[in-house]
Design a protein with these regions (language model features):
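A short, local hydrophobic-aromatic micro-motif
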Residues: 46-47, 70, 136
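A short, well-structured juxtamembrane/interface segment
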Residues: 34, 97-102
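Boundary-proximal intrinsically disordered activation/regulatory segments immediately upstream
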Residues: 1-59
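Glycine/small-residue-rich loop that forms an oxyanion/phosphate-binding "nest" at active or ligand-binding sites
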Residues: 58, 64-97
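RNA substrate-binding interface of SAM-dependent RNA methyltransferases
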Residues: 42, 103-142
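Structural motif
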Residues: 30, 49, 90-92, 111-113, ...
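Short, glycine- and charge-enriched coil/turn segments that flank and shape catalytic ligand pockets
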Residues: 54-68, 100-109
């Protein structure tokens, strides 16, 4: 069990949570909460951290049955968590990388192609709308 915020794994986790540059350099991101953990493909998981309280629940242990995880002291988990009331589970996830060939493969390819979107709010709206319309990928310039 991890009992200190000085633990190397916790330091790395904190850095990933706080620094976009670090996430980009390592091709990793962090998800928090039961729903987000459940939606993350298992093969993309690079690490799972759970609080003592979380793992003491039988249903939660079933959720973790197919993945290795680290138990973190409740106080340490609260310190590293990004939310006001943590659910008790954080996962480090590998960012998938797709080539254009990957996106064009398949019978039902529907791409949203964007150029020079300046407002992040507009980008989010377009992606959510596209998802509702059944897009299978997004292509955009920097």
């Amino acid at each position: 069990m991890i009992t200190s915020t000085s633990n190397q794994q916790i330091k790395k986790l904190s850095l990933l949570m706080k620094k976009a540059k670090e996430r980009k350099e390592q091709d990793l991101f962090v998800v928090e909460g039961v729903k987000m953990f459940g939606e993350a493909p298992r093969e993309w998981l690079a690490g799972v951290y759970v609080s003592e309280q979380f793992v003491s629940n039988e249903e939660h242990r079933k959720l973790l049955s197919d993945v290795p995880y680290e138990i973190v002291a409740d106080s340490v988990f609260r310190a590293v968590s990004d939310t006001q009331t943590p659910q008790g589970i954080l996962a480090v996830v590998r960012m998938p990388k797709y080539t254009m060939d990957d996106m064009l493969r398949g019978d039902q390819t529907h791409l949203l192609i964007l150029e020079s979107v300046q407002d992040p709010g507009n980008l989010g709206t377009m992606v959510r709308t596209g998802e509702g319309a059944g897009i299978t990928g997004v292509v955009m310039n920097r």
